[in-house]
Amino acid sequence: MDEFHRYGKEDNSRQQCFLYPLFFQEDLYAISHDHYLDGSSSSEPMEHLSSNDQFSFLTVKRLIGQIRQQNHSIVLFVNCAPNPLADCKKSSYSESVLEGLTLVLEVPFSIRSKYSVEGMNEWKSFRSIHSIFPFLEDKFPHSNYISDARIPYSIHPEILVRTFRRLIRDAPSLHPLRSVLYEYRNSPENLQRSIIVVPRVNTRFFLFLWNYYVYECESILFSLLKRSSHSRSLAHRPFPQRTHFHRKIKHIIIFSRRNSLKSIWLLKDPKINYVRYGERSIIAIKGTHLLVKKCRYYLLLFRQCYFHLWSEPYRVCSHQLSKNCSSSPGYFLRVRMNPLFVRTKMLDELFIADLITNEFDPIVPIVPILGLLAREKFCDVSGRPISKLSWTNLTDDDILNRFDQIWRNLFHYYSGSFGRDGLYRIKYILSLSCAKTLACKHKSTIRVVRKELGPELFQKSFSKEREFDSLPFSSKAAARSQRERIWHSDIPQINPLVNSWQKIQDLKIENLFDQ
């Protein structure tokens, strides 16, 4: 790959004109085959690779020849016959070809990222991560509206090809990409006019498509947001609308400061903050309700005009921050803004000023979490723990690990919230549901299970704030930690309860717009 990168660095025009021949280099597919064996072609390591023992580069070369013919006869996604190229998920040949296509397409973007301007959104071919908790504590106190937007992942393959065409001038290099996309769209599993591009697909090829698609969406959106946030502050009288504002500002009559002290305002552009997690994004806005409606309309119109996508109105949901419970990143988060008074005093002039700021005060939404636990059959509607019958076929360690994983995720996320007393009720429900599940599996009672397995087994799984116990706090630091909030970013995976809640919210919003 270093040779390919040096090849593209020599001359930008050469890189644009001679990208297509790289698809037919056997060395490229040898590299892609090594990536496939190492498990780097997916977000999770491959476990069973026995079919790769008889891997033949001659077969790959024949497959490359079929791509060269441009007759759409290659079989990468269609599951038919005993053809070794049939199953995309199991065939090493198909994975190697897709890996090779991805490596070639990543070349111009990786070169571009090295020369990107500092502070701009850099390209990541198959990795994208955003900071969530600093965003909440820094931006939420200065916002009063939240928009939860879902990125549309059903897109026509030709739109993806055209977005690549804006950067890659070598048109023949996009023919194999177009062939693969159309073949995937016409496969029996995806008989529709669009293809589904989601970050949950493990293959490197679809992760590359997803991140490039999101990169295109965010690059234009970021430029508009930065243009809005870096505008100069000007003196003006209040206008009903901002249409042709720069033209109107020239006709303002400048009065003396003594006469116009009360009538001249400072223009402060609305503060718009953006963060994305997966296929969902949060836009925090400080402004009026009319501004929020305009931003929502702009997002829908932007997707419709730029990507030729019809986005349903419920994909962009806005609500007031202080009155509703938001979901970030897939968890519940209810925010309460507490006024924080800060008094400053100048010693020389004896000047005292009182500053009022909003404090980010997240609280644990116990009622929605109990509703999730009831929906997932951990408890009933009243909050009484019940056994998880669908997990009785698992081993004891798997059952304990699953319950422990749910509790650790919830505790890690809400460890920085005030009023964590409700978490102990959730802990009680999960621990008792775990005990009832084990008792149902062994066809005994909770008392017998506790007697056989021992109470220390439950204490090991549901330890009380073991994350805090592992920190070397002194006595003063321990007392201070009880007053301050400590955020834990060690969330290994999204809580499985979140998917259930997200489906409920989506159905409610869709039904609201259908009425």
From Swiss-Prot:
GO terms for molecular function: RNA binding. GO terms for cellular component: chloroplast. The keyword Chloroplast applies. The keyword Plastid applies. Disulfide bonds: none annotated. One of its GO terms (biological process) is mRNA processing. InterPro entries: Domain_X, Maturase_MatK, Maturase_MatK_N. It is found in: Plastid, Chloroplast. Keywords: Chloroplast, mRNA processing, Plastid, RNA-binding, tRNA processing. Belongs to the intron maturase 2 family. MatK subfamily. Usually encoded in the trnK tRNA gene intron. Probably assists in splicing its own and other chloroplast group II introns. PANTHER family: MATURASE K. This is Maturase K. The gene is matK.
